[in-house]
């Protein structure tokens, strides 16, 4: 009886539609929401979303591919089929700060143009609640260094954030405010610091120097107490403090924002900073050396990353999210470092085991035949999403691997090259991408023949 009543309670929660669900934060949010009983529709612009995302969501999740926020008609169809007035929408489709600096026009089309299209689709079906991830990139040089709040952004609408990235985030907040006025909407936003993951899923954001250092830690050493030639290269001033949040704390904060009673949200525009940790590179490196005493680094400043690092606040306020959302961070710097390094060690162990499985002649090197045999045996057999595309994806995948890993072009992949590649890649995820590409090509060929594809 107890189990039945709990099931009914969980299934009664309104649906959550996530746009941009295949990113690092999106994947974790999908899994966290379904774990709390929310029915989740995960959408992204790629035609086929990762099988790992569907498995993480289970029966409460639905994956919808081929949804680009810049495509008004596709978005409208998505909302007509999967959303109503009770649906909560998350718009996570946006490039990173450094990516925006490199191509502001494209970033604006995705960030602000995408938000405008999402809000139009919401109005079309009567959806009210939208949650948006803002960023510390919205704060400029005039912002307080400590105790920064989302309220400050509201009270200083004309401050210069110092980047196109920050201007575009401000534009999204303005669009949501207009949506609230014109359609009685319930927009909410969370100002995020740098997000720290235990998985190797990050991109090229400014705060991700910390994850790069943690990833490099087991492989960097010093010589006579000085950084070796291959020491980790720190792209920002090692004494600059920046706010961060570990992904477990972040999920708690995002879900608290989504589930909060509208009447309890007292901050302007229902915006809240989600604080976590705050540390300098030097403080991080001290903690890393407790695990790897030989960790070495050299400073080689990246102009864009260092500019942002010096521009943003040192710390975010904890008062408002605790008062209205019941959120406060739990993960310390020591906890975070131990967690991330432990995850890397587990991944390294799995990598070593996979290499040993493939290295059937125990030479410490891999041939193309050995790699393809492993992929077919362990990654394809019994996986419907791979097998239905035919076996062509496997050969193309192995060709791609050999092109990347056979550095000497002698048909051999060394352990060093394979382990380095595996730090940032998953063979299963890479194979999935290749399978999706092959399936898309098959669909296109079938349409060109005048038929409707069924693969």
Tell me what each language-model feature is:
Residues 18-36:
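N-terminal Rossmann NAD(P)H-binding glycine-rich loop of SDR-like oxidoreductase domains
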Residues 69-110:
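NAD(P)H-binding glycine-rich loop region in Rossmannoid oxidoreductase-like domains
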Residues 139-140, 160-164, 185-208:
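Flexible, glycine-rich beta-alpha linker
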Residues 227, 235-237, 243-347:
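C-terminal substrate-binding subdomain of Rossmann-fold SDR/epimerase-dehydratase oxidoreductases
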Residues 350-363, 390-415:
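Primarily EF-hand calcium-binding motifs
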Residues 366-386, 414-428:
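Amphipathic regulatory helices of Ca2+-sensor modules
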């Amino acid at each position: 009886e107890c189990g039945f009543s709990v099931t009914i309670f969980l299934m009664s929660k309104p649906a959550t539609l996530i746009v941009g669900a295949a990113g690092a934060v999106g994947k974790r949010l999908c899994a966290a929401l379904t774990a709390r009983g929310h029915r989740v529709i995960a959408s992204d612009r790629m035609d086929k979303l990762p099988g790992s995302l569907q498995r993480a969501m289970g029966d409460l999740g639905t994956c919808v591919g081929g949804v680009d926020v810049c495509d008004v008609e596709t978005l409208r169809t998505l909302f007509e089929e999967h959303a109503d007035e009770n649906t909560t929408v998350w718009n996570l489709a946006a490039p990173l700060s450094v990516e925006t600096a490199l191509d502001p026009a494209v970033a604006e089309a995705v960030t602000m143009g995408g938000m405008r299209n999402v809000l139009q689709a919401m109005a079309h079906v009567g959806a009210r609640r939208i949650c948006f991830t803002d960023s510390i990139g919205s704060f400029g040089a005039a912002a307080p260094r400590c105790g920064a709040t989302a309220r400050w952004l509201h009270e200083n609408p004309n401050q210069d954030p110092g980047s196109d990235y920050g201007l575009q985030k401000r534009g999204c907040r303005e669009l949501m405010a207009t949506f609230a006025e014109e359609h009685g909407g319930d927009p909410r936003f969370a100002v995020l610091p740098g997000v720290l993951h235990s998985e190797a899923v990050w991109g090229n954001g400014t705060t991700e120097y910390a994850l790069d250092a943690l990833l490099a830690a087991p492989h960097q050493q010093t010589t006579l107490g000085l950084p070796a030639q291959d020491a980790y290269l720190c792209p920002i001033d090692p004494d600059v403090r920046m706010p961060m949040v570990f992904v477990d704390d972040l999920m708690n904060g995002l879900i608290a924002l989504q589930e909060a009673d509208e009447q309890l949200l007292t901050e302007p525009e229902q915006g809240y900073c989600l604080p976590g940790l705050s540390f300098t590179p030097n403080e991080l490196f001290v903690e890393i050396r407790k695990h790897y005493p030989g960790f070495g680094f050299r400073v080689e400043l990246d102009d864009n990353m260092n500019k942002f690092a010096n521009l943003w606040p040192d710390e975010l306020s904890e008062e408002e999210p605790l008062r209205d959302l019941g959120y406060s961070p739990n993960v310390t710097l020591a906890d975070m470092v131990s967690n991330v390094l432990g995850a890397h060690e587990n991944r390294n162990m799995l990598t070593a085991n996979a290499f040993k499985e493939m290295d059937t002649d125990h030479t410490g090197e891999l041939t193309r035949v050995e790699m393809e045999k492993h992929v077919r045996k362990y990654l394809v057999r019994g996986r419907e999403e791979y097998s239905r595309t035919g076996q062509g994806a496997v050969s193309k995948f192995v060709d791609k691997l050999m092109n990347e890993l056979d550095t000497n072009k002698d048909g051999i992949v060394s352990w060093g090259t394979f382990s380095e590649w595996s730090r940032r890649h998953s063979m299963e995820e890479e194979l999935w991408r290749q399978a999706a590409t092959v399936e898309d090509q098959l669909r296109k060929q079938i349409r060109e023949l005048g038929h409707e594809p069924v693969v």
